[in-house]
């Protein structure tokens, strides 16, 4: 939640020696933290068609191929998931009404609320503007030939250091995921990565679908 993001930011500032006059005391023992993510496809399928979900699990465990009809049905539901995404309210509306349009309206509200909420936690107007631009720019970044994040698409004169803090905040709030380039073949968990070359992904595929400009009703 937003309040938890604020607490985490305060803790990070204290760790980094931000020079805040008032000492920040984390309420140990009074807060239970639970990270909630958008629903993945398995969870979406479980709620959409539990019989098919169970069939897929059984087929996987027994190492048997799905029948073509079941496979086609699963693909159809997967395409639905790509449009609806995994935000619980959007999924709930879609499952109850079968309407991509009504589900998309929920997504638009959530998307706009995310943007509006960013101004509560940024240190400066510049940081607010950059965080919003980064969030709104994810599809554009991934739709170009090189999928790697390009700072100049956020601002022509900006450097990597200028967007580091907004990206850190967006990651901390679980609004996006950052994937850095691994320098060499992964053999151990501690393999170094190149932090200057990375890609950003929205945490919810439905919001990514909305950001792409795809009209959900086109696929009905």
Region spans (language model):
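Interdomain motor-coupling "hinge/lid" segment immediately C-terminal to the ATP-binding subdomain
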Residues: 2-3, 8-143
């Amino acid at each position: 939640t937003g309040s938890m993001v604020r607490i985490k930011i305060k803790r990070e500032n204290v760790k980094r020696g931000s020079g805040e006059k008032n000492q920040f005391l984390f309420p140990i023992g009074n807060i239970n933290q639970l990270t909630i993510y958008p629903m993945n496809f398995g969870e979406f399928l479980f709620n959409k068609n539990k019989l098919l979900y169970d069939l897929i699990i059984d087929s996987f465990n027994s190492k048997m191929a799905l029948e073509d009809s079941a496979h086609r049905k699963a693909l159809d539901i997967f395409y639905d998931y790509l449009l609806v995404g995994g935000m619980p309210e959007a999924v709930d509306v879609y499952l109850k009404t079968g309407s991509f349009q009504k589900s998309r309206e929920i997504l638009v509200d959530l998307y706009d609320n995310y943007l509006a909420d960013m101004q509560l936690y940024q240190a400066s107007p510049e940081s607010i503007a950059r965080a919003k631009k980064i969030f709104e720019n994810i599809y554009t970044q991934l739709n170009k030939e090189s999928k790697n994040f390009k700072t100049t698409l956020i601002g022509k004169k900006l450097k990597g250091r200028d967007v580091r803090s907004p990206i850190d905040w967006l990651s901390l709030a679980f609004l996006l995921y950052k994937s850095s380039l691994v320098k060499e073949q992964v053999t151990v968990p501690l393999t170094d990565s190149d932090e200057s070359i990375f890609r950003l992904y929205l945490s919810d595929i439905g919001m990514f679908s909305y950001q792409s400009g795809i009209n959900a009703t086109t696929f009905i």
